[in-house]
């Protein structure tokens, strides 16, 4: 028996846009829903199932393209239910596509993929765009994912009637399984496509541009919708998840959005004060060091850290000075330091004198 044209079922033209198709479906679904029809429930259920199936095909870009090219065989792959209650979860489930929610996605949706991306701290801090290459299954261009040789027919599986699923009754429960005859495809291909050998999918290397937002850190992941494995005909592709790993930096340590670094300074600069250069992710900056600076003193440079991921502004750069003790002194330098040390009194080393005074009182 010939099947009705899906466009005729919904009462729309073949060039109707998505908005027109959805409007027609909503109107017809409301009119013919079995819960709203008082008489002849069986006919209402049949009509409603017909409307629902037509909308499932024409509202999906890939399914509609396959239907336009191959007719009912191309569009029907993995759509609908085989026997049992055609209304699944009831009124709310059926109208899920109109009012939100709805049934679980087809099992033939493409798998999600993961790509581990290592970037340096500067790219993580400031944002960047990087190119990656991933191996993935994509829809065969030769047969548009149908799996059949061009110009040949694809037969509907006689066991599952093209649905790809069969239902069996076990006591009070109905169990649904993939059809063993067609391996869940809903179709029988007599003359396979020479490119994909009837699979509808081909393995390719694809280059993608990934936008890295400023402020990402190790553990963050970026989702690229539809860039996972391609689904079988009529089913959506999976997603690609890019897992970010930030390399350890030679100078900076990161804590949230702040950067820390240790800056060595010489004894004279620490004692007398002066200017020193400190690194940032972009360039070098000069900061003033006051006289009498001690090891461990912190200098905070506002907004010179990592950009915030979800708001404006950046963290800070915190530089900790470390006074470097001179080494490899010659005799003259040693004598000069000795004279300098002898000339210093308690007021020049207040912390040392305070410490030794405490020691004396402690030991009596």
From Swiss-Prot:
Sorted alphabetically, which Pfam families does this protein's record hold? DnaJ, DnaJ_C, DnaJ_CXXCXGXG
Quote the subcellular location field of this record: Cytoplasm
In terms of one coarse class, where is the protein primarily found?
A: cytoplasm
Residues that, per the record, bind Zn(2+) 1: 140, 143, 193, 196
Lineage, top-rank taxon, reads Bacteria
Q: Does the keyword Glycoprotein apply?
A: no
Which GO BP terms apply?
Answer: chaperone cofactor-dependent protein refolding; DNA replication; protein refolding; response to heat
Q: What InterPro entries does the entry give?
A: DnaJ (IPR012724), DnaJ_C (IPR002939), DnaJ_domain (IPR001623), DnaJ_domain_CS (IPR018253), HSP40/DnaJ_pept-bd (IPR008971), HSP_DnaJ_Cys-rich_dom (IPR001305), HSP_DnaJ_Cys-rich_dom_sf (IPR036410), J_dom_sf (IPR036869)
The residues that hold Zn(2+) 2 are 157, 160, 179, 182
GO cellular component annotations, sorted alphabetically?
cytoplasm
Cofactor(s) required for function per UniProt:
Zn(2+)
GO MF, one term, reads: heat shock protein binding
| Keywords of the record | Chaperone, Cytoplasm, DNA replication, Metal-binding, Repeat, Stress response, Zinc, Zinc-finger
| Record text on cofactor binding | Binds 2 Zn(2+) ions per monomer.
Positions annotated as zinc finger (CR-type): 127-205
Alphabetized NCBIfam families for the sequence: DnaJ_bact (TIGR02349), PRK10767.1 (NF008035)
Q: How does it assemble?
A: Homodimer.
Q: What is known about what this protein does? A: Participates actively in the response to hyperosmotic and heat shock by preventing the aggregation of stress-denatured proteins and by disaggregating proteins, also in an autonomous, DnaK-independent fashion. Unfolded proteins bind initially to DnaJ; upon interaction with the DnaJ-bound protein, DnaK hydrolyzes its bound ATP, resulting in the formation of a stable complex. GrpE releases ADP from DnaK; ATP binding to DnaK triggers the release of the substrate protein, thus completing the reaction cycle.
Give the domain section of the comments.
The J domain is necessary and sufficient to stimulate DnaK ATPase activity. Zinc center 1 plays an important role in the autonomous, DnaK-independent chaperone activity of DnaJ. Zinc center 2 is essential for interaction with DnaK and for DnaJ activity.
**In which family does this protein belong, per the annotation?**
Belongs to the DnaJ family.
Please state what the protein is called.
Answer: Chaperone protein DnaJ
């Amino acid at each position: 028996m010939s099947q009705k044209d899906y466009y005729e079922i919904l009462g729309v033209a073949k060039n109707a846009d998505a908005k027109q198709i959805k409007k027609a479906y909503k109107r017809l679904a409301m009119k013919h829903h079995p819960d709203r029809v008082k008489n002849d429930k069986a006919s209402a259920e049949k009509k409603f199932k017909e409307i629902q199936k037509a909308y499932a095909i024409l509202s999906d870009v890939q399914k509609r393209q396959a239907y336009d090219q191959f007719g009912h065989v191309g569009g029907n792959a993995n759509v609908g239910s085989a026997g049992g209650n055609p209304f699944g979860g009831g009124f709310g489930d059926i109208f899920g596509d109109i009012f939100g929610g709805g049934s679980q996605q087809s099992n033939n949706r493409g798998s999600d993929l993961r790509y581990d991306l290592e970037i340096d701290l500067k790219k993580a801090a400031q944002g960047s765009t990087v190119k990656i290459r991933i191996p993935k299954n994509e829809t065969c261009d030769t047969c548009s994912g149908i799996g059949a040789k061009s110009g040949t027919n694809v037969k509907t599986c006689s066991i599952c009637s093209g649905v790809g699923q069969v239902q069996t009754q076990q006591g009070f429960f109905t169990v649904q399984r993939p059809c063993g005859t067609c391996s869940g495809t809903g179709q029988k291909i007599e003359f396979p496509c020479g490119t994909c050998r009837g699979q509808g999918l081909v393995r390719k290397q694809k280059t993608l541009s990934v936008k890295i937002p400023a402020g990402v850190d190790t553990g963050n992941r970026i989702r690229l919708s539809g860039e996972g494995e391609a689904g079988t005909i009529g089913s959506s592709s999976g997603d690609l998840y890019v897992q970010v790993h930030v390399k350890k930096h030679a100078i900076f340590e990161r804590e949230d959005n702040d950067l820390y670094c240790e800056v060595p300074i010489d004894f004279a600069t620490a004692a007398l004060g002066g200017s020193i250069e400190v690194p940032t992710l972009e360039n070098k900056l000069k900061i003033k060091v006051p006289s009498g600076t001690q090891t461990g003193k912190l200098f905070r440079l506002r907004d010179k850290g990592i950009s915030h991921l979800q708001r404006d502004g950046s963290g800070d750069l915190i530089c900790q000075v470390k006074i470097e003790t001179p080494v490899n002194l010659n005799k003259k330098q040693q004598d000069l330091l000795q004279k300098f040390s002898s000339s210093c009194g308690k007021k020049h080393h207040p912390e040392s004198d305070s410490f030794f005074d405490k020691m004396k009182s402690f030991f009596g």
